């Protein structure tokens, strides 16, 4: 029975890539800098002391990071008994965003340039805004700028509730984000507005990767809170991913947990499981692993590393989340049967010690575990697509156009 379990620790980079200078990210190191801050006692909120990741260390995380940066992460166990194959991968794709990273993991790098709204103020073309107001029958809009999603709620959330005007904002990523109050504006209405925005962006040729619905609750600055009802409207990958090939060629199952289905525009996904928060994502993953039959991929995105800690530059929160993940990792490993493969990786970096609030261009860890996987170094992988090619080979699918089999 062939089953693969892919866990994406969203934004968990392990050192700047060779082209990081093109992105302003030379020297970024999500894992390394978190570990250093912990060792200095600068991440003692809700946790304390050096970063402790014994189970990830046994899978080779520390050694992969050392291969990536030349430095072993402070606090991790140098003498851990390695039970998995480990390496690090560079990104071929032109961006450091979520879709690019995930599509490349699935064997389809993004070699074209996304469109971006690069103006910090008045970010969106007036023509686009006018169409959205008209088609969605809006009283107007707020924002129209670059912003952190939490900051803009404190700035404009109250006005949004009073006026019914949605909050439009973007970032350094190829995104059009819409924040609306779940109760005063309504969730269904927000989703409808996002569908209209997706259509207008596509028809207008803007080449924007994602429209993101950002629902929130609360009644005043300081207690506004984004909910788990986020919804991403992505464009479809430009070629068949290994997910789609498994479904098409083998009649296989691909179970999405978290935001995976949205990232791939639901192409190559046969089942979607919703869960919010690290523990809930873990619980859902365990349930689906127990149920998984032959020719199945269970694919989970642990978004909180990125959305709650990376972008918010919360070092202690990121460290605590990693330690929680590590504590629960044996629950996943215990469900790995003789022919199974468990793959742990990331989609980009988001160094919480780095200036700004955006992603960082970094290598990602590639940690592979299974009874038939030979422990040891996989070395430097030149593209995330090596993961997709490896999975395609494992399931006896037609080869991907990019990537090399690692096993």
From Swiss-Prot:
GO molecular function: magnesium ion binding; manganese ion binding; phosphopentomutase activity
Keywords per UniProt: Cytoplasm, Isomerase, Manganese, Metal-binding
Keyword Isomerase in record: yes
InterPro entries, alphabetized: Alkaline_phosphatase_core_sf, DeoB, Metalloenzyme, Phosphopentomutase_DeoB_cap_sf
Entry GO terms, CC: cytosol
Pathway the protein contributes to: Carbohydrate degradation; 2-deoxy-D-ribose 1-phosphate degradation; D-glyceraldehyde 3-phosphate and acetaldehyde from 2-deoxy-alpha-D-ribose 1-phosphate: step 1/2
Cofactor requirements of the protein: Mn(2+)
Amino acids binding Mn(2+) 1: 10, 347-348
Binding site for Mn(2+) 2: 306, 311, 359
Cofactor note: Binds 2 manganese ions.
Domain of life: Bacteria
Catalytic activity from the UniProt record: 2-deoxy-alpha-D-ribose 1-phosphate = 2-deoxy-D-ribose 5-phosphate; alpha-D-ribose 1-phosphate = D-ribose 5-phosphate
EC code(s) of this entry: 5.4.2.7
Keyword Calcium included in the entry's annotation: no
GO BP field: 2-deoxyribose 1-phosphate catabolic process; 5-phosphoribose 1-diphosphate biosynthetic process; metabolic compound salvage; nucleotide metabolic process
Protein localization: Cytoplasm
Pfam families xref list: Metalloenzyme
Described function: Isomerase that catalyzes the conversion of deoxy-ribose 1-phosphate (dRib-1-P) and ribose 1-phosphate (Rib-1-P) to deoxy-ribose 5-phosphate (dRib-5-P) and ribose 5-phosphate (Rib-5-P), respectively.
HAMAP family noted in UniProt: Phosphopentomut (MF_00740)
Family, as annotated: Belongs to the phosphopentomutase family.
Name of the protein this chain belongs to: Phosphopentomutase
Organism the protein comes from: Yersinia enterocolitica serotype O:8 / biotype 1B (strain NCTC 13174 / 8081)
């Amino acid at each position: 029975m062939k089953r693969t379990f892919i866990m994406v620790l969203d934004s968990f980079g392990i050192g700047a890539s060779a082209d990081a200078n093109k992105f302003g990210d030379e020297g970024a190191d999500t894992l390394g800098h978190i570990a250093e801050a912990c060792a200095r006692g600068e991440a003692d909120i809700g946790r304390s002391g050096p970063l402790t990741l014994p189970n990830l260390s046994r899978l080779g995380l520390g050694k992969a990071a050392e291969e990536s940066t030349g430095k072993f992460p402070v606090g991790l166990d140098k003498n851990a008994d390695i039970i998995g194959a480990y390496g690090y991968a560079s990104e071929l794709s032109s961006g450091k965003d979520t879709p690019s990273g995930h599509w490349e993991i699935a064997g389809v790098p993004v070699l074209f340039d996304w469109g971006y709204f690069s103006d910090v103020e008045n970010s969106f073309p007036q023509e686009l805004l006018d169409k959205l107001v008209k088609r969605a029958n809006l009283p107007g809009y707020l924002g129209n700028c670059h912003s952190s999603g939490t900051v803009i709620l404190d700035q404009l959330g109250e006005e949004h509730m009073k006026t019914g005007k949605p909050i439009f904002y973007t970032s350094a990523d190829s995104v059009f984000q819409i924040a609306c109050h779940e109760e005063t504006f309504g969730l269904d209405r927000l989703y409808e507005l996002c569908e209209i925005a997706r259509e207008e962006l596509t028809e207008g040729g803007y080449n924007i990767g994602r429209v993101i619905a950002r629902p929130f609750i609360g009644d005043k600055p300081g207690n506004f809170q984004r909910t788990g009802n986020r919804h991403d409207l992505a464009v479809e990958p430009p070629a068949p991913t290994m997910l789609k090939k498994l479904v098409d060629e083998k009649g296989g199952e691909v179970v999405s947990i978290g935001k995976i289905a949205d990232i791939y525009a639901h192409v190559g996904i046969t089942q979607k499981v919703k869960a919010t928060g690290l523990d809930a994502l873990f619980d859902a993953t365990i349930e689906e692993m127990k149920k998984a039959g032959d020719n199945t991929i269970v694919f989970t995105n642990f978004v909180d590393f990125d959305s709650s800690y990376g972008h918010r530059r919360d070092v202690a929160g990121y460290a605590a989340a990693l330690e929680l993940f590590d504590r629960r990792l044996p629950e996943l490993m215990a469900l790995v049967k003789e022919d199974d493969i468990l793959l742990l990786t990331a989609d980009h970096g988001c160094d919480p010690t780095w200036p700004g609030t955006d992603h960082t261009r970094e290598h990602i860890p590639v940690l592979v575990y299974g009874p038939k996987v030979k422990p040891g170094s996989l070395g430097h992988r030149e593209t995330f697509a090596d993961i997709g090619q490896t999975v395609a080979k494992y399931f006896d699918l037609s080869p991907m156009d990019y990537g090399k089999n690692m096993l």
